């Protein structure tokens, strides 16, 4: 099973960290589970310090969509468009959206 965990903002990582850790535990136990962490923002987002991920016990996102805009309509459109491409590139069985 391939699980995609989508986070749109920094606080979402705190909410979903227990889920990500459990997915990793299952994988280490030999269960057929893979995961991908997708972040809507940019890779060099200053709010995503390495310490955040080490404190939460999870890895940094695997994919950064690079959405960086202020207008809500533009933001929504860019996230939908770029996430669709991401899912086409990385087939997924389950999507967990954290908001």
Segments from the language model and where they lie:
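Conserved nucleotide-sugar phosphate-binding/catalytic loop shared by glycosyltransferases and other
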Residues: 31-75
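Active-site and donor-binding regions of nucleotide-sugar-utilizing enzymes
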Residues: 4-7, 12-22, 28, 52, ...
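Nucleotide donor/acceptor-binding cores
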Residues: 1
């Amino acid at each position: 099973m391939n699980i995609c965990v989508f986070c749109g903002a920094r606080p979402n990582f705190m909410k979903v960290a227990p889920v990500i850790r459990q997915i990793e535990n299952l994988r280490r136990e030999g269960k057929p589970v893979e995961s991908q962490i997708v972040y809507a923002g940019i890779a060099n987002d200053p709010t995503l310090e390495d310490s955040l991920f080490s404190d939460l016990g999870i890895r940094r996102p695997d994919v950064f969509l690079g959405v960086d805009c202020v207008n809500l309509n533009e933001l929504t459109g860019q996230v939908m468009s770029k996430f669709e491409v991401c899912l086409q590139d990385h087939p997924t069985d389950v999507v967990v959206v954290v908001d």
